[in-house]
Amino acid sequence: MTEPNDTGPALQAEHLGKVYDEGPARIEVLSDVSLSVARGEMVAIVGASGSGKSTLLHILGLLDVPSSGTVSVDGVPAAGLSEKRKSALRNRSLGFVYQFHHLLPEFSALDNVAMPLIVRRENRDRARAQAREVLELVGLAAREEHFPGQLSGGERQRVALARALVTRPACVLADEPTGNLDRHTAHNMFELLTRVNRESGTAFVIVTHDPELAARADRQLHMENGRLQPD
């Protein structure tokens, strides 16, 4: 597998298409979508439900394959990679944050954050040390031994963000990261996302319905009928 290239875009997609054949019907979900995300850039993608935003995020995250077009992550083209190598690229160079935190309830905040490194068979002590660093970055150093059930909704989402950052990815893909939070907590999450983006130099691609969060991004793009265009 080609080694990551830290001088080019964190994430690049060219002429993506996605088509589902359902019986006699042919459903085009994405049409000729191209996107280049610079290192350290925050890009917001907005659009109505069903416009193709989540499908695009899944393809950018190497969780789905396009019907046409190419994706490169950290300078590495995904086309032609085996599932094992694609998984390794995803785990090394991408982080994910979802509307629901998906934390493991039986593990502490610290061990939830360290989990991506432990799965990669990193030394456990080193993984926990790295997890402590990112928990401090998101303001939860004092809560590392608490379990998800002992944390507020906003704290759980911050743990999820720390987990996405612990591998030091080139890019974090966030799908409605504030969608399950109340207005005040969502505002605090906006502040955290922009600060982490600035301080860590990690690129972010954020799918959101929230105009306030989208307005904080370096660039806003609008998805409509499977096509991506400047907002």
Curated annotation (Swiss-Prot):
Pfam family, one: ABC_tran
Source species: Bordetella pertussis (strain Tohama I / ATCC BAA-589 / NCTC 13251)
Matching SUPFAM superfamilies: P-loop containing nucleoside triphosphate hydrolases
Bilayer topology: Peripheral membrane protein
EC number: 7.6.2.-
GO-annotated cellular components: plasma membrane
Stated name of the protein: Lipoprotein-releasing system ATP-binding protein LolD
Function: Part of the ABC transporter complex LolCDE involved in the translocation of mature outer membrane-directed lipoproteins, from the inner membrane to the periplasmic chaperone, LolA. Responsible for the formation of the LolA-lipoprotein complex in an ATP-dependent manner.
Localization in the cell: Cell inner membrane
CDD domains: ABC_MJ0796_LolCDE_FtsE
Listed GO MF terms: ATP binding; ATP hydrolysis activity; transmembrane transporter activity
Gene Ontology terms: biological process: lipoprotein localization to outer membrane; protein localization to outer membrane
Keyword Nucleus listed: no
Domain ABC transporter: 11-231
Keywords from the UniProt entry: ATP-binding, Cell inner membrane, Cell membrane, Membrane, Nucleotide-binding, Translocase, Transport
Quaternary data: The complex is composed of two ATP-binding proteins (LolD) and two transmembrane proteins (LolC and LolE).
PROSITE patterns listed in its UniProt record: ABC_TRANSPORTER_1 (PS00211), ABC_TRANSPORTER_2 (PS50893), LOLD (PS51244)
DNA repair found in the keyword field: no
Binding site for ATP: 47-54
Family note: Belongs to the ABC transporter superfamily. Lipoprotein translocase (TC 3.A.1.125) family.
